[in-house]
């Protein structure tokens, strides 16, 4: 009987554990409204409250942060910003505007959670 119970538990674990993998990865939500050729080079970053240039179009947004069990090393400010910049390049953005930057907090998440908007300059 113990052997059968052990086999059932092991089978259940082999089915459950792979489905938990997404909980250990950086959460990333990308919404792109307009598609452009990928951008190469430097992507400018505008901080919250900073004046945005004129003649721009918002092409999308990116949210990155903790997904549940994300290791702290995988959701530092640098890792989150690199992820946002990579997504901005794929979408063809010229610059990023940081809407919200939530720093790690001992009462909540130990990871950065960043919301950014992706913009492109209007070409005349």
List each model region and its residues:
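Sec-dependent bacterial lipoprotein signal peptides
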Residues: 1-21
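Bacterial Sec signal peptide processing site at the extreme N-terminus
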Residues: 14-36
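Post-signal peptide N-terminal segment of mature Sec-exported envelope proteins
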Residues: 30-51
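Extracellular disulfide-stabilized recognition modules
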Residues: 51-61
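Short acidic, glycine/proline-enriched helix-loop-strand junctions
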Residues: 57, 66-68, 104-124
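Short, well-ordered alpha-helical segments
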Residues: 59-100
